[in-house]
From Swiss-Prot:
Annotated ranges, domain TrmE-type G: 214-375
Protein's organism: Haemophilus influenzae (strain ATCC 51907 / DSM 11121 / KW20 / Rd)
SUPFAM superfamilies: P-loop containing nucleoside triphosphate hydrolases, TrmE connector domain
Official protein name in the record: tRNA modification GTPase MnmE
Taxonomy, superkingdom: Bacteria
Binding of K(+), residues: N224, T243, I245, T248
């Protein structure tokens, strides 16, 4: 017999309304014990919530959803009372006294919904993403995922792969036919079509990943180059202390901002130089750690100081120490001191923005550059949120499609192509949970809120 679980569905703390959710075959037993009756399915009933001795603990709305017409696909009882934490704890304690009832694990209600085919894995993850959304655009995209937009695109890809895989395996199973199915062009055309179809989904998923997770941008450079001033300009507030004293910033400062809906984690770091004391040395060490973990570096140069703005010196002192794959944007700051105009150009293979963090002249140029460099498109009509595991699965599927194309066009190897298509199908199915390990499911749902 399946277990019956209970948890508080509203956030802990004081509030106007507090909700307890019960799911499982004993939900009606809980209703009888607490309410004295089971409400009619999908009908709100205003009733007292009673303790074991008949004492009224609270009173409020009771809702009963009969299996399979509920969020979890099981019998569900919701008790909506007053939001005082003590009241909710007393009611929860009473329910847990009933034989066969236990406290739900984090995300267990959503896990039950997934296991009972009420929603797939991508939709279940969208619930957590909707709760954690930090912008209006993220909310809209999470709702798209919850409504099955992402899953629909993935399932269409899976259907295309299954069709092609069936065709390829049929050509292998009937080698005596006069028609050479592998050479008639149909398989290659279909395969290239799937590759293009997958690229479209990958592009949208990358947008969705940026929207969900944000991008980590580290501001680095010599002391007194204006790094903290730029952080304040981008954040729109005095987030960092700014003085004319070199080395004012000793530790890492973090700000979460949005540029036209694109979330960015902006990180201000200590000035990079030979440290003059132990505290500054620790700050510089932390700065390099942040730099190594960044999605993009903003390298600040002081345009009023010819020596510090010398690109050849910057290349040897700083750029040569970075991983070759790490994107860098060079910012020439303090143009207000020499009368320059804000501009964007390319020098030495790097995009260069000339601006004044003090007057904010050119800061909007940097904002637009970051948005473009990150590949973010404002609006994202019809977009969906995506997680890192989704991108990994799509990337692996794309890799095996390309391998399959080589097996077909260069080696005429139908058996090897069929195996690559099987792997593609497996990776895509991981996204929606059709083929997913129990360990992965545990990791995903354990990150959810209790009561979700």
């Amino acid at each position: 017999m399946k277990e019956t679980i209970v948890a508080q569905a509203t956030a802990p703390g004081r509030g106007g309304i507090g909700i307890l959710r019960v799911s499982g075959p004993l939900a009606t037993k809980v209703a009888q014990a607490i309410l004295g009756k089971c409400p009619k399915p999908r009908m709100a009933d205003y009733l007292p919530f009673k303790d074991a001795d008949g004492t009224i603990l609270d009173q409020g709305i009771a809702l009963y959803f009969k299996s399979p017409n509920s969020f979890t696909g099981e019998d569900v009882l919701e008790l909506q009372g007053h939001g005082g934490q003590v009241v909710l704890d007393l009611l929860l304690k009473r329910i847990l006294q009933i034989d066969g009832i236990r406290l739900a694990r984090p995300g267990e209600f959503s896990e039950q919904a997934f296991l009972n085919d009420k929603l797939d894995l991508a939709q279940a993850e969208a619930i957590a993403d909707l709760i954690d959304a930090t912008s209006e655009q993220a909310v809209r995209s999470a709702l798209k995922s919850l409504q099955g937009e992402f899953s629909k695109k993935v399932n269409e890809l899976v259907d295309s792969v299954i069709y092609l895989r069936t065709y390829v395996e049929a050509s292998i199973d009937f080698p005596d036919e006069e028609i050479d199915f592998l050479a008639d062009g149909k398989i290659e055309a279909n395969l290239r079509g799937i590759i293009n179809q997958l690229e479209d989904v990958r592009s949208e998923a990358k947008q969705g990943s940026i929207l969900r997770e944000g991008m980590k941008v580290v501001i680095a450079g010599r002391p007194n180059a204006g790094k903290s001033s730029l952080l304040n300009a981008l954040a729109g507030r005095e987030a960092a202390i700014v003085t004319d004293i070199a080395g004012t910033t000793r530790d890492v400062l973090r700000e979460h901002i949005h540029i036209d809906g694109m979330p960015l984690h902006i990180i201000d770091t200590a000035g990079l130089r030979d440290a003059i004391d132990e505290v500054e040395r620790i700050g510089i060490s932390r700065a390099w750690t942040e730099i190594e973990q960044a999605d993009r570096i903003i390298l600040m140069l002081d345009s009023s100081d010819p020596e510090s703005a010398d690109l050849s010196k910057v290349r040897s002192e700083f750029l040569a120490k970075l991983p070759s794959t790490l994107p860098v944007t060079i910012v020439r700051n303090k143009i207000d001191l020499n009368g320059e105009q804000a501009s964007e150009s390319e020098q030495g293979g790097y995009q260069m923005i000339s601006l004044s963090a003090q007057t904010h002249d050119g800061v909007q140029l940097l904002r637009e550059h970051l948005k473009q460099a990150m590949g973010f498109q404002t609006g994202m009509e019809g977009g969906f949120l995506a997680r890192r595991r989704h991108l990994d699965a799509l990337d692996k599927a794309a890799e095996h499609l390309q391998i399959g194309l080589v097996q077909l066009t260069e080696f005429h190897a139908g058996e090897l192509l069929a195996e690559e298509l099987r792997l593609v199908q497996s990776y895509l199915s991981e996204i929606t949970g059709q083929f997913t390990s129990d360990d992965l499911l545990g990791n995903i749902f354990s990150s959810f809120c209790i009561g979700k």
